[in-house]
């Protein structure tokens, strides 16, 4: 079976791009003929490892769909998008399945090809008609399923997977809380909120030996640094850049704290859980509630309830036995629901291969 996976720009090293590469490698390992189509190429190489058999193709002369020039924007939203669909039909007549992870849609199709779309963001009403062009729409979490099904019939839930589940577990006696993510200008991960929560916790002497490690880069990093200084938390909060040796960071932590306002899925929660780390998150629209079992593997807190979040975090910090119990269940959930073998069986069923 010949499969094509698309990406906006496979070279930028984002979360979606990593998912595309992981899925491509998994299909290749199952014996499929796999190709990735990237519409853009900001950097010279893809930052993620691809198996040697996988073909990487860049779409010829793709225009910048994010241009601010009004006439170009109008052209890109109308004529050019149809041109891309027509060109793809010509280029990929031999594909049995095309799995979209991009802004483009299959306005023109080949009869022998099935078309799928993985939605890495929340439901967009403006895309309802265009999403009906796909044979199946794949969403990552259950929380939005009812909304999707009220608008579109062809919807499936297939989560992301971890390529490997580590044998090692963290030592949960370490007094470190960890949070990882891109530090964007609009603070989507709400690191500043986490800093404010941390300030309230540090008022109590029994928690002053604990450290908060924030790992990430981005335009919003300076604002986070300023907030830490303004609240005089330099001694208990450490900012670190992104690292390829992220395993060391997980193995140095006893709690993972997420405060995001939105998540496509929340791969960091999976990764932390795979090391036996109990996780905390606000119960936002998508993501965390599929990974965290509240009061069993971690805590889910009503969105924006900072007081309760702080109280639950203090409870975990205070009780190592609770951390051990939550961490054990967290790892079990990853094995049961998010291993590569489990998720690829779902893909094979969708593709009528099993």
Go through each PLM region and give its residues:
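Short hydrophobic beta-strand element within catalytic cores of glycosyltransferases
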Residues: 278-282
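Aromatic "clamp/platform" in nucleotide-sugar-dependent glycosyltransferases that forms part
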Residues: 261
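Conserved donor-binding/catalytic core segment of Leloir-type glycosyltransferases
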Residues: 4, 169-198, 213
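Donor nucleotide-sugar binding/catalytic pocket of nucleotide-sugar-dependent glycosyltransferases
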Residues: 134-167
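Nucleotide-activated donor-binding/catalytic signature segment of Leloir-type glycosyltransferases, i.e.
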Residues: 225-241
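A short, well-ordered alpha-helix in the C-terminal region of glycosyltransferases
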Residues: 308, 315, 322-349
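N-terminal strand-loop element at the rim of the active site
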Residues: 5-13, 26-75, 218-220
């Amino acid at each position: 079976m010949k499969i094509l996976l698309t990406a906006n720009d496979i070279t930028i090293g984002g979360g979606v791009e990593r998912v595309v590469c992981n899925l491509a490698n998994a299909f290749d390992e199952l014996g499929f003929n796999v190709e990735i189509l990237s519409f853009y190429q900001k950097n010279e190489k893809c930052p993620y490892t691809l198996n040697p058999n996988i073909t990487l193709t860049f779409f010829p002369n793709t225009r910048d769909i994010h241009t601010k020039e009004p006439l170009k924007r109008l052209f890109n939203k109308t004529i050019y998008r149809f041109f891309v669909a027509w060109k793809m039909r010509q280029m990929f007549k031999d594909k049995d399945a095309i799995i979209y992870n991009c802004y483009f849609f299959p306005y023109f199709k080949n009869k022998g090809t099935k078309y799928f779309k993985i939605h890495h963001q929340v439901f967009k009403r403006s895309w309802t008609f265009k999403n009906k062009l796909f044979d199946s729409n794949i969403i990552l979490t259950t929380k939005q399923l009812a909304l999707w099904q009220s608008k579109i019939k062809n919807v499936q839930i297939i989560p992301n997977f971890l390529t490997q589940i580590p044998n090692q577990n963290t030592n949960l006696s370490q007094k470190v809380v960890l949070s990882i993510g891109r530090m964007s200008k609009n603070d989507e991960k709400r690191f500043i909120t986490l800093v404010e929560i941390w300030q309230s916790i540090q008022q109590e002497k029994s928690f002053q030996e604990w450290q908060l490690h924030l790992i990430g880069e981005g335009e919003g990093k300076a604002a986070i640094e300023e907030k830490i200084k303004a609240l005089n938390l330099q001694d208990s909060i450490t900012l670190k850049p992104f690292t390829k040796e992220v395993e060391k960071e997980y193995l140095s932590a006893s709690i993972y704290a997420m405060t995001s306002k939105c998540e496509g899925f929340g791969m960091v929660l999976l990764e932390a859980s795979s090391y036996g780390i109990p996780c905390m998150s606000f119960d936002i629209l998508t993501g965390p509630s599929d990974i965290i079992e509240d009061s069993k593997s971690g805590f889910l807190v009503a969105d924006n309830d900072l007081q309760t979040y702080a109280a639950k975090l203090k409870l975990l910090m205070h009780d190592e036995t609770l951390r051990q119990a939550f961490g054990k269940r967290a790892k079990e959930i990853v094995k049961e629901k998010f291993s590569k073998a489990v998720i690829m069986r779902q893909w094979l069923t969708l593709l009528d291969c099993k």
